[in-house]
Every structure is written in structure tokens, then in C-alpha cells.
């Protein structure tokens, strides 16, 4: 009986994770680095990594609004302009997109592979 409960909980968790991933893919468009470069200067560029990661290096022109603070700071992001998100490897940006969509953002883009795949200009704290 207890094995069955564990199996049901595990199956529910897997279904939740798949549903969350599918939803993220529907509400944000994942862009290649080339596509991302073509549009991010005309949009709001948000780095959702933590401050220590941001200070270690970030895309030139990005604002740091960590995922851990996004719900409290969501009003800093305009809903009438496109939002370009990135994190270290695209996991946190998907979760950030869900929060922003609930706040009214409709144009949300994500950097494929995240910052670790970025080959463009970066700024790092000295």
C-alpha cells in the first residue's frame, strides 16, 4: 500500500513538471542568441539570476531582478513592452515568465541556453 502511495505522488509530480514546462513554452518564446541580439535593445532586458551571479558578469544593458524577488518587484517591469529574460541556463527564466504572464506581460522571450551560452558583450564588476 505505501509503495502505491509513493508511486502516485511520484506520478503526480512528473505530471506537474511536464504541465509546467508545456505552459512555459506556450507563454514565452525561446530565441537563439542571434534572434535575442536582434531584439533585446528595444525591449526590457531582465537578468533573473541572483545578485552575486549578475555581478560576476551579465549582458550589457541588463537589469537584475532575481527570480527570488520578482513577485515583490514585478511592478518595475512594464507590461506594454517586450520582456527579454535570461538566467544561467534557462530554468529560472521559465519560472519568471509564469510570474510575468500573471502580471499582464504578453511578449516574453527567453535566451536559449541562458547566460552560459551567451557569446556577446558582457559587463562584469571589477
Curated annotation (Swiss-Prot):
It comes from the Bacteria. The keyword Aminoacyl-tRNA synthetase does not apply. SUPFAM superfamilies: Rhodanese/Cell cycle control phosphatase. It is a single-pass membrane protein. It comes from Bacillus subtilis (strain 168). The lineage of its organism: Bacteria, Bacillati, Bacillota, Bacilli, Bacillales. The chain crosses the membrane at residues 3-23. This is Uncharacterized protein YqhL. Residues 39-123 form the Rhodanese domain. InterPro entries: GlpE_sulfurtransferase (IPR050229), Rhodanese-like_dom (IPR001763), Rhodanese-like_dom_sf (IPR036873). The gene is yqhL. Its main location: membrane. Keywords: Cell membrane, Membrane, Transmembrane, Transmembrane helix. Signal peptide: none annotated. GO terms for cellular component: plasma membrane. It is found in: Cell membrane. It holds the Pfam family Rhodanese.
Amino acid at each position: 500500500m505505501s509503495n502505491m502511495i509513493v508511486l502516485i505522488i511520484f506520478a503526480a509530480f512528473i505530471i506537474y513538471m511536464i504541465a509546467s514546462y508545456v505552459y512555459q513554452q506556450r507563454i514565452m518564446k525561446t530565441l537563439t542568441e542571434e534572434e535575442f541580439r536582434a531584439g533585446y535593445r528595444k525591449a526590457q532586458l531582465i537578468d533573473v539570476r541572483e545578485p552575486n551571479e549578475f555581478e560576476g558578469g551579465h549582458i550589457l544593458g541588463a537589469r537584475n531582478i532575481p527570480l527570488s524577488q520578482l513577485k515583490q518587484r514585478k511592478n518595475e517591469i512594464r507590461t506594454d513592452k517586450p520582456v527579454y529574460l535570461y538566467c544561467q541556463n534557462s530554468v529560472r527564466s521559465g519560472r519568471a515568465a509564469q510570474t510575468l504572464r500573471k502580471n499582464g506581460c504578453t511578449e516574453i522571450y527567453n535566451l536559449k541556453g541562458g547566460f552560459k551560452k551567451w557569446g556577446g558583450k558582457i559587463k562584469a564588476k571589477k
